[in-house]
Amino acid sequence: MNIFENAKWIWRDADAEKEEYVFFEKTFNCDPERVCLFIAAETDYIAYVNEKRVSFNQFSGYRNEKYYDEIDISSFCQKGENTLRVTVRHEGVNSACRISDGAGLIFSVRENEKEIAFSDEETLSSLSSEYTSYIVRHITGQLGLSSTMDSREKKEEKKRSREVSLCMNLLPRPVKPLEILEKRRAVPIETSGRRIYDLGREECGYLYLRVKCESEGLVRVVYGEHVTDGCVRYRIGGRDFSLDFNCRAGESYFEQLFVRVAGRYFEVFGDTEVLEIGLIPVLYPLTEKPIDEKIKGLDRRIYETAVRTLRLCMHTHYEDCPWREQALYVLDSRNQMLCGYDAFFESDFQRANLVFISKGKREDSLLELTYPAVNTPAIPFFSVMYPVAVYEYVCATGDKSIIPEVVDTMRGIMNTLYGRITDRGLIPNLPSPYWNFYEWSDFSAGHNELGNNAPRAEKYDLILNCAFIYSAERFSALCEEIGESADFDLDSIKEAVSREFFMPESGAFKLSSAYDTVSQLGCAFALLVGLGDERTLSFVRCEREGVIPATLSMLGYVYDALIKSDENAVEFVLDDIRKKYSYMLEKGATSFWETINGDSDFANAGSLCHGWSAMPIYYLNRLL
């Protein structure tokens, strides 16, 4: 069945601009029996049937592949005439979560598979009166634009629409729709003259607001994860975590469904009485596995908080952090996937994300930084670890059917990096625009590379080359499962790694060909690929002076290296988890942080909920 057999991509009869909101209206007649709405939009949509909301939250696609939602609207329909109204937001900017690809709406209404209404030029459209168009104000570069709602009286002039040219390769939404939970009301807290409201814990969802104004005016709601400064810290560098509401005189009620927010606190600015403020929480629908009885006391608190952290970072796809970025990264999601096999019964979300990532290829066959996105400062280390995530999925689920779907992407990554090996037998750091990042620590973050297009001196990094070996071993195993081969001379790369980075006088591996700095993560990766000796273990345990400790995101590789190489590793790993994660709990964490430095990191932009920090789930299940 061609679902969109007569439907066209449409927009109002004018060229679309950035941050434009358009509503569309179409009437249809039905019995009704089984009536379904098939719908997709660029950038996002909210759909209503007979004034009742039936769906929102577009799954963002690539330029050559879009995704549609299928919604059973039978219970919203009546016999005879019905009205479909759709508000569409065209954001018009690239971000870490979306690719700007024009403005448009396409839909088909079907009763018992017969098309009874569809998007075409006869569909009425107008600028939306519920949103203020053309206010281009970024929340963050990763999230994209903020949004302004409007309750003032404005006339909507409905006219015919026009057809627009957008991709007709439309596939079903690859993941389930979000689960909408009961509203969570924020309560005012005692402050010195500021209107601050507390949700009680870290949450993620959509803001709702009821206010009363003496006259028309602007109300601004800002949101954040803490009140360390005695207020909600919402302007951080170039970031602006705020939503605006143009209010009429009297009472206004808003539900802002175009911007998903996260945090714990709201602060309200403007000449208004706040009647109610809170969040409509949303989570990806999952069934949590019972926690093993052996996980008790502090370990159980850590485990439960880690699961909560995972849930807050799963919506249309995995997210690094729900507050600041909401972006899908390979390395962040690899940690989330690994923990999810233990935390939840389902694994369809992991599979869908792995397949979706595989489509985010650059011209040179490496992966973009996030998905869907274009022209990103892509990270080679993240690309090379993609086969590892696929391998772990196959091991955890037994589902080998994913391998043929993503093998070309994996092979492209591995062949591209292998083809860059120089006469020193190693993969060099990649030139601009690549970002040679490994973790947020000294000498591993590539800070000086972001936005710097100047030529770079040839340099070799320990972690990239060890990660290639680590990934190639797993990629080869995946290839064997489908009768293919992967031919890489890993022994030669190992010899080159030892020759370039091993320091025989200490047993450590230096991070780079450019300096002798040693990190816990670098030595851990050396052990993971079979290099080093017993002395290297002391650096992985951070028992030697000057070793740069691994950050929360990379602790899994440290723990794996110790478990592989040290018969006494179990207590070390458990003690390390308890020390680091109890510290966050003692500081009031209701989800686990991006780094152990909390909100003060990244020039006061550290996230207090980050999916990559859920790793205790994996180790508590195995080591207790």
How should each PLM-predicted stretch be described?
Residues M1-D320, D332, D348-F349, N353, ...:
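Extracellular/oxidizing-compartment recognition motifs
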Residues E325:
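Phosphate-binding glycine-rich loops and their immediate beta-loop-alpha structural context
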Residues G92, L328-F344, D348-L624:
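Active-site core of glycosidic bond-cleaving carbohydrate-active enzymes
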